[in-house]
Amino acid sequence: MVRFEFTDSADKHGIPHPDAEHAVMHHVEYEILQPRRTGEQSFMFVGLPHPQALRYLEVGVAVDGRGRRIIFHAMEVTDLYRH
């Protein structure tokens, strides 16, 4: 099972953690971002928060050098990631 950690900024828009995790695990699209810190890889995933959802989420995830997956951003998808 993949485990995620959440930063305070991930909670800014009130997206429940299980919804953000589901969107990442069942994403329909992703983009590689500039790393937030040295030694990290950062991604923005777009996916549904649950199978019956009509609106997509964008979820930012950083993977650090130890393999920890850290969700730092979660909100309804914006035009920047809507394709």
Q: Where are each of the predicted segments found?
A:
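Ribonuclease/tRNase effector modules and their secretory precursors
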Residues: 1-83
